[in-house]
């Protein structure tokens, strides 16, 4: 009888878990729809903007040769909440594979900062902003840009790269690296294959144009990366909670079957005892 009560207690616990994971799945679904709409609204502008900037970048005369020992400021876009599958760990794996001892990291989101604080011997963190969903807009990204550039100048780094998650579909998201500064020709050719090596005439001059578009490009890339990463986070959490709910339901079915068998055996034993007493 005691074991039957224990099984019943476990069943109640699993039922409570199902309610929680199912509620979290629905919340994640609502956020997914919100960020997908936002992402779709800005995608056309971003593609055309990257194409225009890319056409300018590939027209640069005599691009500077990249030194082999470039020191990088990594902008790590992670979540501030957990329970989102491999969303954060995949970005950590990608950055670990490309991180060098002199590199620094500016964290946008709390989760991956705690990972690097615990697992890195280099103390790479130079900035942290706990991004909330309601904060993600173009104006806010401009204030983030100022803080990132302050860190970039203070530590005398050579380039800035984003670590974000690219959205393929609701089931597939892929961690990506994207060089934001200085402009990289190959990056733009990868982003948009139609970008060509056609030479352009610049007015007033090439350097002035580059100086004008650099902060604008940074803001656009930052905003786009945050929106897309939040979209991927929502999709990943939705999938994780759906899997957790399914696993909990499977476990509940197992406990229910076990409970029914024990109850049946208990009732059978009681009937046998009653019949035996009558005899």
From Swiss-Prot:
It is found in: Cell membrane. It comes from the Bacteria. GO terms for biological process: proton motive force-driven ATP synthesis; proton motive force-driven plasma membrane ATP synthesis. GO terms for cellular component: plasma membrane; proton-transporting ATP synthase complex. Keywords: ATP synthesis, Cell membrane, CF(1), Hydrogen ion transport, Ion transport, Membrane, Transport. It is a peripheral membrane protein. Its main location: membrane. GO terms for molecular function: ATP binding; proton-transporting ATP synthase activity, rotational mechanism. CDD domains: F1-ATPase_gamma (cd12151). Produces ATP from ADP in the presence of a proton gradient across the membrane. The gamma chain is believed to be important in regulating ATPase activity and the flow of protons through the CF(0) complex. F-type ATPases have 2 components, CF(1) - the catalytic core - and CF(0) - the membrane proton channel. CF(1) has five subunits: alpha(3), beta(3), gamma(1), delta(1), epsilon(1). CF(0) has three main subunits: a, b and c. Belongs to the ATPase gamma chain family. This is ATP synthase gamma chain. It comes from Mycoplasma genitalium (strain ATCC 33530 / DSM 19775 / NCTC 10195 / G37). The lineage of its organism: Bacteria, Bacillati, Mycoplasmatota, Mycoplasmoidales, Mycoplasmoidaceae.
């Amino acid at each position: 009888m005691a074991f039957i009560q224990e099984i019943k207690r476990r069943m109640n616990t699993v039922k409570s878990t199902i309610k929680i994971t199912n509620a979290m799945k629905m919340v994640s679904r609502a956020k997914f729809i919100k960020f997908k709409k936002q992402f779709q609204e800005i995608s056309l502008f971003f593609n055309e903007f990257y194409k225009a900037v890319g056409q300018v970048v590939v027209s640069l005369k005599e691009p500077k040769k990249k030194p082999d020992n470039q020191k990088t400021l990594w902008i790590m876009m992670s979540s501030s909440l957990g329970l989102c599958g491999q969303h954060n760990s995949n970005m950590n794996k990608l950055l670990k594979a490309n991180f060098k001892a002199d590199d620094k990291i500016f964290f946008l989101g709390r989760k991956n900062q705690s990972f690097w604080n615990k697992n890195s011997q280099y103390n790479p963190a130079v900035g942290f902003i706990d991004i909330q969903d309601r904060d993600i807009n173009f104006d806010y990204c401009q204030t983030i840009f100022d803080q990132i550039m302050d860190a970039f100048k203070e530590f005398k780094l050579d380039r800035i790269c984003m670590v974000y998650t690219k959205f393929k579909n609701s089931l597939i998201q892929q961690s990506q690296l994207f060089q934001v500064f200085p402009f990289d020709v190959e990056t733009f050719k990868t982003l948009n294959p139609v970008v060509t090596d056609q030479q352009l005439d610049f007015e007033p001059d090439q350097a002035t144009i580059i100086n004008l578009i650099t902060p604008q490009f940074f803001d656009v890339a930052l905003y786009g990366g945050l929106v897309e990463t939040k979209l991927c986070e929502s999709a990943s959490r939705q999938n994780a909670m759906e899997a957790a709910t399914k696993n909990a339901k499977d476990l509940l079915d197992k406990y229910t079957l076990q409970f029914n068998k024990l109850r049946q055996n208990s009732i059978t034993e009681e009937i046998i005892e009653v019949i035996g007493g009558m005899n």
